[in-house]
């Protein structure tokens, strides 16, 4: 007899975001389809990336303690397998180039559009 109560684990998304209201918006968009872990700065994000083994990271560029680019570089020193999608309210071409050079998998601008965000996550999680 099969157990109908078993379900697949939802993918775990690490959200590195220092502004609580921005995290709450992402939570509203993502919580039905994903388990979420919140890092409030880059240092926490690096710690959680290797302690909690998320399936993907959604990372703000402008954060205290360690910014998103430095955090991405730290993650990339240890793995290139973890998908990292950078997000910023400052959509400068230099930010995009710097993030790509550091090894990000995608780049989205704030305010985040739910369809665009889910498209990126689906691309790297399926």
Question: Could you describe each region identified by the protein language model?
Answer:
Residues 63:
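Receiver (REC) domain active-site loop signature in two-component systems and cognate sites
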Residues 68, 100-105:
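As written
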Residues 18, 41-44, 67-73:
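Acidic catalytic/metal-coordinating carboxylates
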Residues 19-37:
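Two-component/phosphorelay signaling modules centered on CheY-like receiver
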Residues 112-121:
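C-terminal output helix
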Residues 38-56, 77:
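Acidic, metal-coordinating helix/loop segments flanking the phosphotransfer/catalytic sites
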């Amino acid at each position: 007899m099969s157990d109908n109560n078993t379900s697949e684990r939802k993918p775990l998304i690490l959200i590195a975001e220092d502004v609580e209201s921005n995290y709450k918006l992402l939570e509203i968009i993502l919580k039905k389809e994903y388990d979420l872990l919140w890092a409030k700065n880059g240092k926490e994000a690096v710690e959680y990336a290797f302690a909690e083994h998320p399936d993907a990271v959604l990372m703000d560029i402008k954060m205290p303690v360690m910014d998103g680019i430095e955090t991405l570089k730290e993650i990339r020193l240890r793995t290139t397998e973890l998908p990292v999608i950078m997000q910023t309210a400052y959509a400068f071409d230099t930010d995009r180039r710097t993030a790509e050079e550091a090894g990000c998998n995608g780049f989205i601008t704030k305010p985040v559009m739910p369809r665009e965000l889910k498209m990126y996550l689906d691309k790297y999680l399926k």
